[in-house]
Swiss-Prot record:
Molecular function, one GO term: phosphoribosylanthranilate isomerase activity
Superkingdom to which the source organism belongs: Bacteria
HAMAP family: IGPS_B (MF_00134_B)
Phylogenetic placement of the source organism: Bacteria, Pseudomonadati, Pseudomonadota, Alphaproteobacteria, Hyphomicrobiales
Class of the enzyme per the UniProt entry, highest EC level: lyase
Protein EC: 4.1.1.48
Similarity comment: family membership: Belongs to the TrpC family.
PANTHER family, sorted: INDOLE-3-GLYCEROL-PHOSPHATE SYNTHASE, TRYPTOPHAN BIOSYNTHESIS PROTEIN
Protein name: Indole-3-glycerol phosphate synthase
Keywords annotated in UniProt: Amino-acid biosynthesis, Aromatic amino acid biosynthesis, Decarboxylase, Lyase, Tryptophan biosynthesis
InterPro entries assigned: Aldolase_TIM, Indole-3-glycerol_P_synth, Indole-3-glycerol_P_synth_dom, Indole-3-GlycerolPSynthase_CS, RibuloseP-bd_barrel
Organism for this UniProt entry: Brucella anthropi (strain ATCC 49188 / DSM 6882 / CCUG 24695 / JCM 21032 / LMG 3331 / NBRC 15819 / NCTC 12168 / Alc 37)
Length: 266
């Protein structure tokens, strides 16, 4: 996503946030969060898979994207969540952004309620209000994209997530962002293999940035991971956790495709 696209997204997100704040206060969101099941432990679920010697998959529920258009016409979040769980995924990632991804908050709630996996709110966050929103919808983790926020906002988003018992996935796509991410507390670092200016995807980004991460950080490979061989390639750089959406979303049998991606066996 180019800087221009990120700017456009920020503009409509800030409008969305202002409209949401006019409708519901943070106190309202906190009350709604009380009705939700407690956070399921997103980071913990990933660690459990890795401790068992398995790849840990954050499986994405995504209807469409700005670059690819409609990805899955028969879009059924609860059924997809169950298929991912049956296929061995550790966690879910659910798009809640409507203008660019045809996502929705109710997709997150419905997907999470259909299975026992923890769920990430996949969205562009520019205000701690959105973290409270995420928890009120049932999210167990938030995404902080360092290409779109400064250090102070990143820290505020992370602290709010931790206060609510959630985890935070910090997304980076170059060396400068990795250095910034290492100053935050979260041990969960997503490396986006997509160049935000050219849209080109290259797994070498993960291989390169993995050298900067201390052993206590868990690296998540994002974008450009389509096969079990891709997973094995990144494993050589110490990456055994992946966020994968589009390649699985396009499959007729999502559970079988998930299993094959993780194990190499049909």
């Amino acid at each position: 996503m180019s800087t221009d696209i990120l700017r456009k997204i920020e503009a409509y997100k800030r409008e969305e946030i202002a409209a949401a704040k006019a409708e519901r206060t943070v106190a309202d969101l906190k009350a709604r969060a009380q009705d939700q099941e407690a956070p399921r432990g997103f980071f913990k679920a990933l660690e459990a898979k890795r401790a068992a010697g398995e790849f840990a998959l954050i499986a994405e529920i995504k209807k469409a994207s700005p670059s690819k258009g409609l990805i899955r016409p028969d879009f059924d979040p609860p059924a997809l969540a169950k298929a991912y769980e049956a296929g061995g995924a550790a966690c879910l990632s659910v798009l809640t952004d409507t203008p660019s991804f045809q996502g929705a908050p109710e997709f997150l709630t419905a997907a999470r309620n259909a299975c026992s996996l923890p769920a990430l709110r996949k969205d562009f966050l520019f205000d701690t209000y959105q973290v409270h929103e995420a928890r009120s919808w049932g999210a167990d983790c938030i995404l902080i994209i360092l290409a779109s926020v400064d250090d102070d906002l990143a820290k505020a988003l992370e602290e709010t997530a931790f206060e609510l018992g959630m985890d935070a996935l910090i997304e980076v796509h170059d060396e400068a962002e990795m250095e910034r991410a290492l100053k935050l507390s979260s041990r969960l670092l997503g490396v986006n293999n997509r160049n935000l200016r050219t849209f080109e995807v290259d797994l070498a980004v993960s291989e390169r940035l993995s050298k900067m991460a201390p052993a206590d950080r868990v690296l998540v490979g994002e974008s450009g991971i389509f096969t079990h061989e891709d997973c094995l390639r990144l494993k050589k750089s110490g990456i055994g956790t992946f966020l994968i959406g589009e390649s699985l979303m396009r499959q007729a049998d999502v559970a079988a495709a998930t299993r094959e991606l993780l194990t190499g066996k049909a």
